[in-house]
Amino acid sequence: MTRAKSGKISKKRHKKILKLAKGYRGRANNCFRVAIEKVEKGLQYAYRDRRNRKRDFRGLWIQRINAAVREHGLIYSQFMGALKKAGINIDRKVLAELAVNNNDGFASIVQQSKAHI
């Protein structure tokens, strides 16, 4: 029985890893042994940061809302509590967008919520 060699498969696997390592610095973009480590670590970072991105954006929205609300004499926690009491169901993403791009619309929401403090 003849020996089964894996030439084509190895070549395909190497090519796939080196394609993922394109743009890396040093030997990481052309040396398979180094590239496979860097690609695996890069994929770990990507997996972790897809989850962290949700956390980071929520924090950013809260900071923007807080800054805009303080101009109207409230703090973030009071504002969010008043929104809930007023029955206004707008998420933080939309509120932050209004605070940055539509000051008049955001001001009217703040006035409506002030009535329920």
Curated annotation (Swiss-Prot):
Record-level GO BP terms: ribosomal large subunit assembly; translation
Enumerate the UniProt keywords alphabetically: Ribonucleoprotein, Ribosomal protein, RNA-binding, rRNA-binding
Cystine links in this protein are: none
* A Gene Ontology cellular-component term: ribonucleoprotein complex
Name a Pfam family for this protein. Answer: Ribosomal_L20
**UniProt-recorded Gene Ontology molecular function terms:** rRNA binding; structural constituent of ribosome
Q: Does the keyword Chaperone apply?
A: no
What's this protein's function? Binds directly to 23S ribosomal RNA and is necessary for the in vitro assembly process of the 50S ribosomal subunit. It is not involved in the protein synthesizing functions of that subunit.
The UniProt entry, under HAMAP family, shows: Ribosomal_bL20 (MF_00382)
Record family assignment: Belongs to the bacterial ribosomal protein bL20 family.
Q: Which NCBIfam families match?
A: rplT_bact
**Protein name, please?**
Large ribosomal subunit protein bL20
